[in-house]
Amino acid sequence: MFGLLGCTRYFESDKGPRVVLDKTDFVMGYHEHIGILAAPGSGKTTLTRLLCGLDAPDEGDFIGLRGDALPLGANSFILPGLTGEENARMMASLYGLDGDEFSHFCYQLTQLEQCYTDRVSEYSVTMKTHLAFAINLLLPCRLYIADGKLYTGDNATQLRMQAALACQLQQKGLIVLTHNPRLIKEHCHAFGVLLHGKITMCEDLAQATALFEQYQSNQATIQTEDYSFDI
């Protein structure tokens, strides 16, 4: 099993501790594909870092091992001074993988063509994202975590990435944190909502969407009231 038990995560601010996750529980099997609806600023990135073992909770327990989960959109490991190919081969070497096979997969998936041998510092944001996605797909892990979105690029690129991910997901789990119900409908079979620092699992996507939309409606009402005034 993998997840969090009674985990709290907070950050100090000028007004005191800001609680992002509040004694939340979230436990899943390694082959499950779970979509969690979460509004911007609700703690998606904080949750991702906890589940990937990058941060430790202030309270509670993390279930699993560091390296079990991989943040699918992470690109901080990409070195701008190296070429795309050199970055791919470097990561393959670090994990003891075949450099030729690893690099060939990244070249085919990204379709960077001649840019694959250019320095990453010359890449656009999208090109760098595609390279990172390809590399992440081949790194050893037991499940992927996507914070916000899964793919970028034109339709052809997204179809290639979707097919490559689907192949990996035959043996690996997936957690998608997003505000878009359509995204998790396509890729997940269990659904939840991140509200008020806690994850609430739902019976189906319809229930999760209704709960999420109700929360957004309530937040919009509160913001409107905050800006109301008498004339």
From Swiss-Prot:
Gene3D superfamilies assigned: P-loop containing nucleotide triphosphate hydrolases (3.40.50.300)
Compartments, record wording: Cell inner membrane
Cellular component GO terms, alphabetical: plasma membrane
Chain sites annotated for binding ATP: 38-45
GO MF annotation: an example: ABC-type transporter activity
Record keyword ATP-binding present: yes
Domain (ABC transporter): residue spans on this chain: 5-221
Record flagged with keyword RNA-binding: no
UniProt protein name: Vi polysaccharide export ATP-binding protein VexC
Originating species: Salmonella typhi
